[in-house]
């Protein structure tokens, strides 16, 4: 979430770096909002890399958590970010970064970075870490929503083609997917799967939300003339914005208010985590939320998050394993809290569901605030009426 002074030189290279169709696909969702008069805009939507290792008899008893923080500083440094703060419990090491978050568990790494970080450049360091603890690579997923300002990205993130080529170089049997319409809000997902099935348990879940057009009465709280780390001051920010309703006192948290703007928070509770990242500038306001919290229905949690940011539009993506509480509810035909009936103030724009063997489900849904839809319809209707009633 580091908001600093960036060169705008890359803003004029759009036409020179968009020749292959996959690059254009990555751009279509956001070019409609491009305003060259606006100047610098921060890339809020994050890249996400998750790597899971298989523990064997030779694997260190503490797995990846046995490694010193200097290892993770090297991983983070390879993608042009730094560790700002750290918290831990019995199961998770949590790191707030200058560009989002890192979570390290015994058998898993979750690395989430925003801006123009080069996340895929961290793969060699991560594979070295797995080798150091004598683990075996079991699962890799790389995911990002379509970038808001893709012409600002650096290699290998300048196109989906380059990202795919880099991933295939490291994980030749991995497969790419696109969730959602390529000319609107969509996700690129790459998965490498070497899980030995049937395995003892597949009960993971992941809920992610990306939100745009945040309420100005809320975003005003995430501007500052200095950096502020976890303290009474950041607690006051959480209280004023009602973030403390999402991350209550049962969680161990650490957060950071950036200068001149931006905010990040990580929270851990036993084996669960939550993370949020906020870009508050009005012309590119954005917030993201992610958790692996176990629930059979996500509506309460999602409503609390939406209550904080009050976005004009949002996308929710859910990954669920068949043995998770939400996975069992889904497979029994029950609502899991992401369906339209839970959010009457929003209209569903698009829904995509992919089912992977054995019962692993990925679901993505795009919503837009009802008032925004009505305003668009009214404006179009007025324009048509004006055209019909023009001078003879």
From Swiss-Prot:
Keywords: Autocatalytic cleavage, Decarboxylase, Lyase, Polyamine biosynthesis, Pyruvate, S-adenosyl-L-methionine, Schiff base, Spermidine biosynthesis, Zymogen
Cellular-component GO terms for this entry: cytosol
Short name of one Pfam family: SAM_decarbox
Any GO molecular function: adenosylmethionine decarboxylase activity
Known pathway: Amine and polyamine biosynthesis; S-adenosylmethioninamine biosynthesis; S-adenosylmethioninamine from S-adenosyl-L-methionine: step 1/1
Modifications made to the protein after synthesis: Is synthesized initially as an inactive proenzyme. Formation of the active enzyme involves a self-maturation process in which the active site pyruvoyl group is generated from an internal serine residue via an autocatalytic post-translational modification. Two non-identical subunits are generated from the proenzyme in this reaction, and the pyruvate is formed at the N-terminus of the alpha chain, which is derived from the carboxyl end of the proenzyme.
SUPFAM superfamilies for this protein: S-adenosylmethionine decarboxylase
Modified residues (Pyruvic acid (Ser)): 100
Active site (UniProt): 43, 46, 100 (schiff-base intermediate with substrate), 114 (proton donor), 264 (proton acceptor), 277 (proton acceptor)
Positions of the record's site feature: Cleavage (non-hydrolytic): 99-100
Reactions listed under catalytic activity: S-adenosyl-L-methionine + H(+) = S-adenosyl 3-(methylsulfanyl)propylamine + CO2
Annotated signal peptide: none
Domain of life: Eukaryota
E.C. numbers: 4.1.1.50
Keyword match S-adenosyl-L-methionine: yes
PANTHER family: S-ADENOSYLMETHIONINE DECARBOXYLASE, S-ADENOSYLMETHIONINE DECARBOXYLASE PROENZYME
Protein family: Belongs to the eukaryotic AdoMetDC family.
Protein name, entry field: S-adenosylmethionine decarboxylase proenzyme
Taxon lineage: Eukaryota, Discoba, Euglenozoa, Kinetoplastea, Metakinetoplastina
């Amino acid at each position: 979430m580091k908001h600093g002074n960036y060169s705008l030189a890359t803003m004029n290279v759009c036409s020179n770096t968009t020749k292959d169709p996959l690059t254009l696909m990555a751009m279509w969702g956001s070019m409609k909002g491009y305003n060259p008069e606006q100047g610098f805009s921060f890339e809020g939507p994050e890249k996400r890399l998750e790597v899971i290792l298989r523990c064997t008899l030779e694997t260190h008893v503490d797995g990846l958590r046995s490694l010193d923080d200097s290892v993770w500083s090297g991983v983070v440094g390879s993608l042009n970010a730094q560790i700002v703060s750290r918290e831990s419990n019995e199961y998770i090491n949590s790191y707030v970064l200058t560009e989002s978050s890192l979570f390290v568990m015994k058998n898993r790494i979750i690395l989430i970075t925003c801006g123009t970080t080069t996340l895929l450049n961290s793969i060699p360091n991560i594979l070295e870490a797995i080798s150091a603890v004598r683990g075996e690579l079991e699962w890799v997923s790389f995911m990002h929503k379509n970038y808001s300002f893709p012409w600002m990205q650096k290699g290998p993130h300048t196109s989906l083609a380059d990202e795919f080529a880099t991933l295939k170089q490291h994980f030749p049997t991995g497969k790419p997917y696109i969730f959602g319409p390529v000319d609107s809000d969509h996700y690129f997902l790459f998965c490498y799967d070497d899980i030995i099935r049937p395995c003892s348990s597949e009960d993971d879940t992941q809920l992610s939300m990306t939100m745009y057009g945040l309420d100005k009465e809320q975003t005003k709280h995430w501007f500052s003339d200095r950096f502020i780390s976890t303290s009474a001051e950041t607690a006051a920010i959480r209280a004023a914005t009602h973030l403390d309703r999402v991350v209550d006192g049962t969680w161990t948290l650490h957060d950071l208010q950036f200068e001149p703007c931006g905010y990040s928070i990580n929270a851990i509770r036993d084996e669960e985590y939550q993370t949020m990242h906020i870009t508050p500038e009005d012309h590119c306001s954005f917030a993201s939320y992610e958790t692996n919290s176990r629930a059979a229905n996500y509506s309460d949690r999602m409503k609390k998050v939406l209550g904080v940011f009050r976005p004009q539009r949002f996308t929710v993506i859910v990954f669920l394993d068949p043995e998770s509480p939400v996975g069992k509810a889904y497979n029994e035909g029950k609502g899991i809290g992401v369906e339209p009936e839970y959010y009457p103030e929003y209209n569903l724009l698009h829904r995509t569901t992919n089912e992977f063997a054995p019962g692993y489900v990925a679901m993505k849904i795009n919503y837009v605030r009802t008032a925004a839809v009505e305003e668009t319809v009214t404006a179009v209707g007025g324009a048509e009426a004006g055209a019909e009633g023009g001078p003879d």
